[in-house]
Amino acid sequence: MTRAGCAVVAFIAFLGFGIDAGAQSQAANMSFFVTSVGSGKGADFGGLEGADKHCQALATAAGAGSRTWHAYLSTQGAQAVNARDRIGNGPWQNAKGVVIAKDVTELHATNNLNKQTAVTEKGE
């Protein structure tokens, strides 16, 4: 992992695939959250696998653990992994039911992440 990408304790988790637009609860449709708590070891999550595991545990505690979650983090080096390639195609919806972005282009082009929309898995 790049140090810059992991310098903050809170990071973003994404569901690895799009959401169903059916009539489900907001928590059931959540496909994006900012982590509510770190690992207790700063930015050391033990690589992407550890960061994904952390996201999965938080999602499970929030009632959304039946799906696969990925941390929005990249690696560097010869076998680099780009964060945007790990999160599926969208759309992404927060725990309050707000659509953050409909696709990867919108996620990276529009500024729809702010204090009101970048909420934790608990909706806080």
Identify the function of each model-found stretch.
Residues 5-16:
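Bacterial N-terminal signal peptides
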Residues 21-124:
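Secreted/extracellular ectodomain signature
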Residues 1-2:
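N-terminal secretory signal peptides that target proteins for export/translocation
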